[in-house]
Amino acid sequence: MKIGLLCSDDWANFQYSIQKSLEAIGVDCVSYKLQRHLFSYDNQCDVITVPRISEAYSGCDVILLCHSDWEFIQYLPEKSIKINFATGTKYRQSYEFINSKFSAPITIIALPEFQTLAPNPKYLVGAIESDWAVKDVVGRRIRVGHFPSNPDVKGTEDIVRILRNAENCEFIYSTERVSHAENLKRIYDCDIYVEMLASTQGGKPYGSFGITGLEAAAMGKIVITQAINDNGLYNDTYGVNMLNFVKDELGLKKTLSSLLQYKGDYLTGQMESTKEWMEKNHSYKATGLKLMSYINGL
């Protein structure tokens, strides 16, 4: 079976992580996007032009339109199964219209909030692997970080207001846009990473952990984030979850306060367990196997 992946903009380098996941288990995969990412990822999907799409995907049996980019269906082989891979804002704002463009028996969703919007949803979290070693926090002050890709939608103003004067830790944050590699370095300098605190976007439910939270977890950071409308979907799909989900400001305060009460050796153990959890559930191989279990079930 030959699998195709296609999108216009590969937000958060998500499609590339799925490409790597399929390649990790030996699946024949075609993966392109229309333009380079503004975050300057060291590695990302190759770029294609629209006139080349039909030929490039002519041999694909199943094609995932990542980020709900339904517009490319017209260029794809009629015999192929075309699946919506719903990942974010585009689907959130126009899910009914986008659903009408796909006839595949499943929808792959990257966010739990989409489980009530998508026909026959199959949940798949992005894949992240990291060579960064877990930092030992014994005998030193805990560092809490926040480096949003988009402060306006990550709840940065509220996060900074809440954590600026937090006790028993050092809070560091920046809204400066840097390269992806530089951002990973900033995150690695933290022990606890606060990804987001925002329950709505454009009047729609919002607030589900993203790639940055997973990148932090893959380094062994303790991550505080959100999973609005999860309703047990993560645990049902993957089992134990090592992310710390909060619903609101009070939840953020309580979770951080609870974590900071522990001694350094306990926190180091939690960080090691978080990295092991990522390697088990969200490595390239694990993600590729889960995706193919969905596709093979068609």
List PLM regions with ranges.
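Short hydrophobic beta-strand element within catalytic cores of glycosyltransferases
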Residues: 218, 222-226
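Conserved catalytic-core segment of nucleotide-activated headgroup transferases in glycan assembly
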Residues: 126-181
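Donor nucleotide-sugar binding/catalytic pocket of nucleotide-sugar-dependent glycosyltransferases
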Residues: 84, 89-91, 103-135
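A charged, aromatic-enriched C-terminal amphipathic alpha-helix characteristic of glycosyltransferases
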Residues: 264-296
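Extended catalytic core of nucleotide-activated donor transferases of GT-like folds
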Residues: 16, 32-104, 109
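Nucleotide-sugar-dependent
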Residues: 196-212, 225-237
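Short alpha-helical segment that forms part of, or immediately flanks, the ligand-binding pocket
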Residues: 184, 211-218
